[in-house]
C-alpha cells in the first residue's frame, strides 16, 4: 500500500475545499492510503511526513507566495532536509487565489523549489493547457 499526504493551509476554506477534492481523487487509486494534514499541525512535528511515499502541498497565494502558515511548515522541515528524509518521495502542489493572475505560479514554484531542496520528485500535470482545448484564455486554468 502506498501512502500519500495532502499537506495544506486554508485560512478561509477555499484551499481546504480543493484539498478535499484532491483527497477524493487520490483515494480512488487502489491500494493507496491518503491523509489530509493541516500544515500548522505538521509545523509542530514534521517527522510525521517520513512514512509517506508522496506529499501533495496546498496553499493559498498571498502576495505572490505561499501563506505564512505554510512557509512555517516548510521551514520546520530543516532537520528532515539534513537527514535527507524526504529524498526520492513524490511531490506535487496546488494553490488558489481570488484573482485571475495573482502570481499563483510563484506559489507553485515555491513548492517546487521546496521539493527540489529535499530531493523529491515533482509530479507535473499531464493535461494540455485549457486554451488548447478551446477554452477562452481568460477562463483557462493556470498550470505548472
Q: Whereabouts are the PLM-identified features?
A:
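FMN-binding flavodoxin-like domain, especially the glycine-rich phosphate-binding loop
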Residues: 2-4, 14-17, 21-39, 47-59, ...
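Aromatic-flanked redox-active Cys/Sec active sites in thiol-based oxidoreductases
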Residues: 8-12
Amino acid at each position: 500500500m502506498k501512502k500519500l499526504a495532502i499537506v495544506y493551509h486554508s485560512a478561509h476554506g477555499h484551499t481546504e475545499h480543493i484539498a478535499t477534492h484532491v483527497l477524493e481523487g487520490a483515494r480512488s487509486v487502489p491500494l493507496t492510503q491518503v491523509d489530509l494534514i493541516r500544515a500548522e499541525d505538521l509545523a509542530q512535528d514534521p517527522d510525521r511526513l517520513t512514512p509517506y511515499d508522496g506529499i501533495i502541498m496546498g496553499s493559498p497565494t498571498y502576495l505572490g507566495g505561499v501563506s505564512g502558515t505554510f512557509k512555517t511548515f516548510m521551514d520546520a522541515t530543516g532537520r528532515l532536509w539534513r537527514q535527507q528524509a524526504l529524498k526520492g518521495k513524490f511531490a506535487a502542489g496546488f494553490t488558489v487565489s481570488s484573482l485571475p493572475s495573482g502570481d499563483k505560479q510563484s506559489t507553485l514554484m515555491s513548492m517546487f523549489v521546496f521539493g527540489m531542496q529535499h530531493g523529491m520528485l515533482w509530479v507535473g500535470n499531464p493535461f494540455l493547457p485549457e486554451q488548447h482545448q478551446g477554452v477562452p484564455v481568460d477562463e483557462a486554468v493556470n498550470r505548472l
